[in-house]
Curated annotation (Swiss-Prot):
Excises uracil residues from the DNA which can arise as a result of misincorporation of dUMP residues by DNA polymerase or due to deamination of cytosine. This is Uracil-DNA glycosylase. The lineage of its organism: Bacteria, Pseudomonadati, Pseudomonadota, Gammaproteobacteria, Pasteurellales. PANTHER family: URACIL-DNA GLYCOSYLASE. It comes from Actinobacillus succinogenes (strain ATCC 55618 / DSM 22257 / CCUG 43843 / 130Z). Belongs to the uracil-DNA glycosylase (UDG) superfamily. UNG family. It is found in: Cytoplasm. It holds the Pfam family UDG.
């Protein structure tokens, strides 16, 4: 059984990674508010072990409002209301699954526990400043994560929504993985083809064809 520690454990000893952590520490030390909290930065890896990954859902950088980001792409901790992009994901789920019920929260931990790696490509952000840590070096780290999944696993579903995610995933081997692309679920672009993309059902169709247990997208109310 391969773990994240086996696959990317040596990243943490690399100078570029030490530099990322130093920049995050420096930002916090200077009084800036950085999201998510330090203990939550690597939550995606804690909740979805390397050999348990079935689906990779790429986000961009964490939510930059108070109490939103907790280390899982698109997800927010209760009682924070689901942001617009996540609401649009729920709407698409309702379109694909008529019996899907809108959850009363925005936590996607149940997806993560089933094998959906909710990976932002940049893992920290300054409060109120979208993309403020985009040049810290996180992209190098998450490129290595995606590369490891691409090389060492097979029959994964990669959900690439929006041009940033699609560019990030352009090297994925489509002969051994399923790559699904659509516009981002943001209100700015959801109507250009995210709605009606069918990705949630297509994901489960692919998993089923390869004898992999499907994702139950329905989230329990809390």
């Amino acid at each position: 059984m391969k773990t994240w520690k086996d696959v990317i454990g040596n990243e943490k000893t690399q100078p570029y990674f030490q530099h990322i952590l130093a920049q995050v520490h420096q930002a916090r030390a200077s009084g800036k508010v950085v999201y998510p909290p330090q203990a939550d930065i690597f939550n995606a890896f804690k909740l979805t072990e390397f050999d348990q990954v079935k689906v990779v859902l790429l986000g961009q950088d964490p939510y930059h409002g108070p109490n939103q980001a907790h280390g899982l792409a698109f997800s927010v901790k209760p009682p924070v209301a689901p942001p617009p992009s996540l609401m649009n994901m729920y709407k698409e789920l309702s379109n694909e699954y008529p019996d899907f019920h809108m959850p009363n929260h925005g936590s996607l931990e149940q997806w993560a526990q089933q094998g959906v790696l909710l990976l932002n490509t940049v893992l920290t952000v300054e409060r109120g400043q979208a993309h403020s840590h985009a040049d810290f070096g996180w992209e190098t780290f998450t490129d290595h994560v995606i590369h490891a999944l691409n090389e060492q696993r097979e029959h994964l579903v990669f959900l690439l929504w929006g041009s940033h995610a699609q560019k990030k995933g352009q090297f994925i081997d489509r002969s051994k993985h399923c790559v699904l692309t659509a516009p981002h679920p943001s209100p700015l672009s959801a109507h250009r083809g995210f709605f009606g993309c069918g990705h949630f059902t297509q994901t489960n169709d692919y998993l089923r064809r390869h004898h992999i247990s499907e994702i139950n997208w329905q989230l329990d109310n809390i």
